[in-house]
Amino acid sequence: MKKETYLADPCRASSLPFWKTNSVTVPEGMLILREDDPRLEELSHTHADTPYFKLIHPMQRIARPALPVGYCFKTPNEKILSEHIGACYPSERASASELASYRLHPTYDPDLWLAIQDMETNAVIASGIAELDTDIREGILEWVQVSPVYRRQGFGRIIVCELLSRLHGRADFVTVSGKENDPSSPRSLYENCGFESGVIWHVLKKE
């Protein structure tokens, strides 16, 4: 895909960030179709359908909510992030070695690995990973998670807004994707942080 095509409408052009669009091969037996694709209705009878949203932040206004007293930001390593992701998402895993491979991405930036730590217990209670494609100035939110007992307390918004702040002046826009029907309502979180222009992409796997 050409840069100009992607930049004209990043959410509709691809379900993936630009750098992945041109480097990732869709596995055999899988299709990724946009919500307006006329093939969707027919294929839904023969394929398992998982819808994902893709949103964009125009980076014009970024909130900067303060951390509550007793909490601090820290830079986590892949082991800490792997353990936290596993604790937040029982059905998903990201091994330490898999996360370590992110350091090889052309979009890797160590300043965009972030965690919130409870200063009393030293426990990580929220974390996130973002990346930056300096070629087209696209920021990408890869992982954002909050420990179950700390949800609905604003920590997810703090993580997202802090990552956006660190991307400010370096990224012209930031994209994020997630499961549309996830019970933790990630789309609502991102929209509350200023993301917009949602497009649904359907990941279809042959049954």
Model region roles, listed by residue range:
Residues 93-146:
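A conserved beta-strand-loop-helix scaffold within acyl/acetyltransferase catalytic domains
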Residues 160, 182-186, 207:
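Short glycine/proline-centered loop/turn elements that form peptide/ligand docking sites
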Residues 143-148, 152-168, 187-192:
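Conserved acetyl-CoA-binding loop-helix of GNAT-fold acetyltransferases
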Residues 19, 40-43, 186-191, 195:
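Conserved active-site tyrosine of GNAT-family acetyltransferases
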Residues 26-34, 167-179:
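Conserved GNAT acetyl-CoA-binding A-motif
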Residues 63-96:
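Short amphipathic alpha-helix that is part of the acyltransferase structural core
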Residues 7-11, 144-152, 180:
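A short, internal acetyl-CoA/4′-phosphopantetheine-binding micro-motif in the GNAT/acyltransferase core
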Residues 1-68, 202-206:
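Acyl-donor-binding surface of acyltransferase catalytic domains
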